[in-house]
Structures are given as C-alpha cells and as structure tokens.
Swiss-Prot record:
Protein name: Protease HtpX
Annotated active site: 141
Record: residues binding Zn(2+): 140, 144, 218
A Gene Ontology molecular function term of the record: zinc ion binding
GO biological process: proteolysis
InterPro entries named in the record: HtpX_protease, Pept_M48_protease_HtpX, Peptidase_M48
Cellular component terms per the entry's GO annotation: plasma membrane
Family named by the database record: Belongs to the peptidase M48B family.
Cofactor detail note: Binds 1 zinc ion per subunit.
Amino acid sequence: MFNRVVLFLLTNFAVLILAGIVMSVLGVNPAQMSGLLVMAAIFGFGGSFISLLLSKFMAKRSTGAQVITEPRTQTERWLVDTVRRQAQAAGIGMPEVAIYDGPEINAFATGANRNNALVAVSTGLLQHMREDEAEAVLGHEIAHIANGDMVTMALLQGVLNTFVIVLARVVGGIIDSALSGNRDSGRGFAYYIIVFVLEMVFGLFATMIAMWFSRRREFRADAGGAQLAGRNKMIAALERLSLNHGQNTLPSQVQAFGISGGVGEGLRRLFLSHPPLTERIAALRASNGTAM
C-alpha cells in the first residue's frame, strides 16, 4: 500500500509539472488555473474512487453473482478452500467467493483493497475447466488482489480523468478565443461544444494509456497465478481459454479484471484490457514463474 501511495504522489507531481509546461507553452498563467485544477481533481478522482468503493456491490448486482456463505456442494467447498489457501499464501485477507451464471469460461476479482475483495467464477468455467486449470485461474485473480491492481487502476484513472478535464478546458479556451478574435465577451456556446469534443478526443488517448497499463497488469497476474498454482497449470488454463469462443457476458465495469478479455486487431488492440492469449502463454513459457 505504501508503494502505491508513493507512486500516486510521484505521478501527481509529474502531472502537475507536465500541466505547468503545457500551460506555459500555450500561454496560460498556471496561477489563474487553481480553481480548475481543484475542480478537475475532485471530479477526476472522485468518480474513480466512488467506483472503487462500490465495486464489489456493483459487480455482484450486475452479474448476479451468488456469494458462497456456506458451501453446499463439493465444488463450492473446493472453491472456498482453494481461495483461502491462495489468499494466505499471497498474504491477503480472505476474499468473498462467488459464482455467477455465464456460459463463457471466465472469472474476475474486484474490491476496494487487499482485505476486502471478491473473487467470482462463471458457471461456464466450472463446467469446462479441469480442477488444476481452475486453480490457476483463481491464482490469477488472487494475484490481482495481492498486487493492488484495483486501487492502482483507480489512481491511474483519476490522474487521467483530471488531465483530460484540465487540458480540454485550457485548449478549448484558447481555440474559443482565437475563433472569437480574442474578444473578452465570456464563454459562449461554442466553447462548451469545443470542450466536449476535446474531452472525447483526449479521453480516447487516456483510455489507450489505461488499457496499456491493464495489459501489463495481466502479464503480472499471470506470473502471480503461476507462482500460486504452478506455471504448467497457468499455461494450461490460458490454453483452455484460447479454445473458449463464448461471448464475454461480464459487465464493462469488471471486464478489465476478468481472466479473459476481448480480441481485436489493428487499432482495436490499443483499447483492449487484455493482451492476446498467445502472448500471455509465450510470456509464461519464457519465464521462470517469478514472484507477483
């Protein structure tokens, strides 16, 4: 947690420096932008952290996941016991364990912190994966929690949101002034249209950055799953996923934390939260099952 706080502070410091440079280049006095920066930070980080705090509730509600409070079957008992064992090995609190109805082979983890998380698997995973493969998938999700990926993604998204809000308004103000001949007549309707368009454009670039980080995060979670369950099991699980052609039924807010992501070529790959399965398998085969 301390490392993520340091990363958060350093990232914000870097963003402030970059914002100051951008404003200087554009001829904007940063001292006049303090109100905008505060507003942008409140909205940028506020939305991200509200989503993080509500992530378990929203995930359970949107997927219909049923938390296992008292195991009723051998499969449920195995799930709970495996998650407990892996959580202890990873040094995190025992997550809630749930099953949701979905035909695809998938699982996800979410939660506000390492000791208040949820691990859920699809019925399709339980039907189509062997026990050793499912163990590796659970290890992958436990690694996400142990690595603090949900918190880190929220911090990153907050920084990106803040930067998009500020930059869109700074650039929008400059364009509006140029179009109006620098007349000091206040902000017109055109300014808000320009800001809206710029937020969409800058938001696309911000999404690319967030998804790039998410793809790096998946490789690390694969390595963590290999450490907890075994590299061969993790490879076998990903190979099984590569044969899964079912539609991803996970809601968009939790898809980034599933074991299985979308597929795409060309520019579409820049917006994917998961690397291609072939690359993930190759990375595991080239590794030595290093730590999370």
